[in-house]
Structure formats: C-alpha cells, structure tokens
C-alpha cells in the first residue's frame, strides 16, 4: 500500500521528477524569508519587493489551479507568498502613515513655538 502510494507520487506529472515539484519547494524559502522579516522594522523593508511578491503569489496561485495537472503544492506556496507580501505591504504603509503624522505634529509644534516666541 505504501509502495503504491509512493509510486503514484513519484510518477505524478507534478511529482519530484519535475520542475513542477522543485520550483515550489524552493519558493518556500521566499515565504520563510518574508516571515523572518516580521521581526525587522518596516523602515528597512521594500514596499516594491513585497508588492511584487504579493502580486506574483496571487497570480501564480490562480494559474496553478487552472493548468493541467492542477498543482496544489504550487498553489499553496504561492498563496502563502501572497499573504506574506500583503502583510508586509500593510506594515510598511502603516509605518509610512505614522511617520507622516509624526512629521506633521512636529512641524505644528515648531510653528506654535515660533508664534509664541514672536
């Protein structure tokens, strides 16, 4: 029984003898790297990089479910890549919005101090 299941997996059109298996397997490193970047400050993250990862993850997730044979392994890794990218983009945007608010408040305080000094 185990042997038959392994043989079916080994000879599958998206099995380990094909790029359809190894490309998604290697793509998990991008997902893990993105998860590792959760510990980094959004100040040091690239919005373009994570927007690209989010977009490609979403596009290739859909593609993996349309082609024959359906590649659920590829769809899964790309789905998680899109999620990681979206979370990082949202972190970056929140950080940028906070920085603008802090800058605006600082400018208001400076103007207030100048007007009081005059």
Curated annotation (Swiss-Prot):
- UniProt key word Membrane: yes
Enumerate the InterPro entries for this protein.
MPC (IPR005336)
Ordered alphabetically, the record's keywords are: Membrane, Mitochondrion, Mitochondrion inner membrane, Transmembrane, Transmembrane helix, Transport
**What is the recorded membrane topology of this protein?**
Multi-pass membrane protein
* Membrane-spanning segments: 19-35, 50-66, 72-94
tRNA processing recorded as keyword? no
| One cellular-component annotation, GO | cytoplasm
Q: For this chain's UniProt record, which GO biological process terms are given?
A: mitochondrial pyruvate transmembrane transport
What's the stated role of this polypeptide?
Mediates the uptake of pyruvate into mitochondria.
Q: Which family does it belong to?
A: Belongs to the mitochondrial pyruvate carrier (MPC) (TC 2.A.105) family.
Q: How does it assemble?
A: The functional 150 kDa pyruvate import complex is a heteromer of mpc1 and mpc2.
Q: What is this protein called?
A: Probable mitochondrial pyruvate carrier 2
The organism encoding this protein is Schizosaccharomyces pombe (strain 972 / ATCC 24843)
């Amino acid at each position: 029984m185990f042997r038959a299941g392994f043989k079916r997996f080994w000879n599958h059109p998206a099995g380990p003898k094909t790029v359809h298996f190894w490309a998604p397997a290697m793509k998990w490193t991008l997902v893990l790297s993105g998860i590792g970047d959760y510990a980094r400050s959004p100040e040091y993250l690239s919005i373009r990089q994570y927007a690209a990862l989010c977009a490609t993850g979403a596009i290739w997730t859909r593609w993996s479910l349309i082609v024959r044979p359906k590649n659920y392994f590829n769809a899964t890794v790309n789905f998680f890549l899109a999620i990681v990218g979206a979370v990082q983009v949202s972190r970056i945007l929140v950080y940028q919005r906070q920085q603008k608010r802090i800058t605006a408040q600082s400018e208001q305080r400076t103007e207030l101090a100048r007007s009081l000094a005059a």
